[in-house]
Design a protein with these regions (language model features):
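Short, conserved beta-strand segments within well-ordered enzyme catalytic domains
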Residues: 15, 49, 59-61, 75-79
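Hydrophobic, ordered structural segments
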Residues: 65-132, 136-148
Length: 168
């Protein structure tokens, strides 16, 4: 299957922040048949890329010591052509920028924000790393869903910030 064409505003990546990266690698490796490549520790903080059949499907990263009480969490990233403009749109539409846009050397720009209901979502502006290379197949992401405490506010937020066309 060719790599997917990912439109702005669409999910393009997931990663797991975990307290035990070795256990996570073993678990998902056995469950999905993932293989791993760990990036340069100095440049990328030891970020691990998961691949299925040689194609990127997800990332994993070890939580810092100061995050010890925080549960392990999967994050979804939405594609953006301009992470700075997206961060501004987030703030202008009732969201909160938790982590301002930052450069990931050679790979792209990322940011983490809370939508108008407080749900955390990432933004990825690609350069070298475009996002998923495999989707909707066994061992790869197939569906993303937002559980929210305020459905109408969430729908309006994603329509206004990402131009989503929703049928509700």
């Amino acid at each position: 299957m060719p790599s997917p064409e990912i439109s702005p505003g669409a999910p393009c990546w997931i990663d797991l922040m975990t307290s035990d990266i070795a256990a996570a690698r073993q678990f998902y490796g056995e469950l999905f048949g993932w293989e791993y490549e760990t990036g340069d520790a100095e440049k990328y903080g030891g970020y691990t890329t998961a691949r299925k059949n040689g194609k990127t499907v997800a990332g994993l990263m070890q939580k810092d010591a100061d995050q010890a009480g925080m549960p392990d969490v999967w994050s979804t990233y939405l594609r953006s052509d301009d992470a700075e403009a997206t961060a501004s749109a987030v703030a202008a539409n009732g969201g909160q920028v938790y982590m301002p846009p930052m450069d990931v050397p050679e790979q792209g720009h990322m940011a983490i924000f809370g939508d108008a209901t407080g749900a955390a979502v990432g933004v990825w502006q690609p350069r070298e790393m475009k996002g998923y290379e495999l989707v909707a197949e066994p061992g790869a992401a197939a569906w993303h869903e937002l559980h929210t405490k305020d459905y109408d506010a969430a729908v309006k937020f994603y329509q206004d910030v990402f131009g989503w066309d929703t049928d509700v």
